[in-house]
Amino acid sequence: MQKIVILRLGHRPERDKRITTHVGLTARALGAEGMLLASNDKGIKNAIEDVAERWGGDFYVENDVNWKSEIEKWKEEGGKVCHLSMYGINLPDAAGEIKLCDKLMIVVGAEKVPTEIYDLADWNVAIGNQPHSEVAAVALTMDRIAQEEPLKREFGYAELTIVPMERGKRVINNVKEE
């Protein structure tokens, strides 16, 4: 089973709150185990961990990490790094090799990322070499490299569970009131 974490660079708390939250939620939904946030925004950490608590799974967020130290430590422990950028090689050309990786850090920038990232990454991968959303880049990448079907994943310890329906909506509350 793949171990995947997201490293979010350049998050600007006043500007990127919603998009960074959605990067984390998308990564969680598609099988990542956590997100490293290379800036200080406890609100992001709390919001995403609250979702994980209510909807299940063990997703974590580490706040205010040193991005370079995290990448170096990850690689020292045998992990690989995939930087999502519109300047990289196209995802279909790299997905097969990335899919074989057991321990993967996916780096997603907000503002302009340090040029050093391009050298530290094992892969610089693009979604069509066009400007795009970080959320879409994470979703497409995680779907294409999944070793298991990410959309059929079940989350343990969920307080709430959605029952898939063709029409309408149904949510089961798994917490029994005493």
UniProtKB/Swiss-Prot annotation:
Top-level class of the enzyme under EC nomenclature: transferase
Location in the cell: Cytoplasm
Short name of one Pfam family: Trm56
GO BP term, example: tRNA nucleoside ribose methylation
Keywords of the record: Cytoplasm, Methyltransferase, S-adenosyl-L-methionine, Transferase, tRNA processing
Recorded catalytic activity of this chain's protein: cytidine(56) in tRNA + S-adenosyl-L-methionine = 2'-O-methylcytidine(56) in tRNA + S-adenosyl-L-homocysteine + H(+)
Primary localisation category: cytoplasm
EC number: 2.1.1.206
InterPro entries found in the cross-reference section: Alpha/beta_knot_MTases (IPR029028), tRNA_m1G_MTases_N (IPR029026), tRNA_mtfrase_aTrm56 (IPR002845)
A single GO cellular-component term on record: cytoplasm
Positions with a binding annotation for S-adenosyl-L-methionine: L84, G109, A110, E111, K112, V113, I127, G128, N129, Q130, P131, H132, S133, E134
MF terms in GO: tRNA (cytidine(56)-2'-O)-methyltransferase activity
Domain of life: Archaea
Subunit structure, interactors included: Homodimer.
Sequence similarity: Belongs to the aTrm56 family.
Function: Specifically catalyzes the AdoMet-dependent 2'-O-ribose methylation of cytidine at position 56 in tRNAs.
Protein name: tRNA (cytidine(56)-2'-O)-methyltransferase
Highest classification ranks of the organism: Archaea, Methanobacteriati, Methanobacteriota, Stenosarchaea group, Methanomicrobia
